[in-house]
Amino acid sequence: PIGDIVLATNSNRTIADFLATGHYETRPSIRTLASAMDVGAPSNMERLRHLFPDFGSLRTAVECYPVHDQAIRFQIAKDYSRFGRLWCPHTATGFWVYDNLPESRRLDKAWIVVATAHPAKFNNIVQGIVNLQEIEIPPPLASLLELPVQFESLGTELEAFGEALARWDN
């Protein structure tokens, strides 16, 4: 039921390079505006290779394009100006790739661009790009941010993790 699968990534272009060359090589992560994509050794590569054991079928089914920080900034500003909508940096990568597909391809079918997070989660980035004093936080997110922070520091031993899980389960 799904047509084209077009992925967007940031300057950490491990998957884009793999799909372009067929050669998978991990590398150090590069820090970018789209921080959740700052991965030089993507953990989902094993899943991707399992779903598509034949590289040719993977390359036919999936495309991936890297989007650099300058393009992320441009897309956030452009779409805010055009539509009055704000994107988080991750969502902006998807819209940048979509906007840069050939027009005939974009108009040929319906597309879905997957949004990752609310821009308020990245207000320190987005506010400066669109010159806003404040990004309105939606009530559900605001209520989560008001909850007390709870965490427990654990040692690096597996036993410490098991003990913490046992305490949490009770």
Residue ranges, per PLM feature:
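PLP-dependent amino-acid enzyme catalytic core
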Residues: 1-170
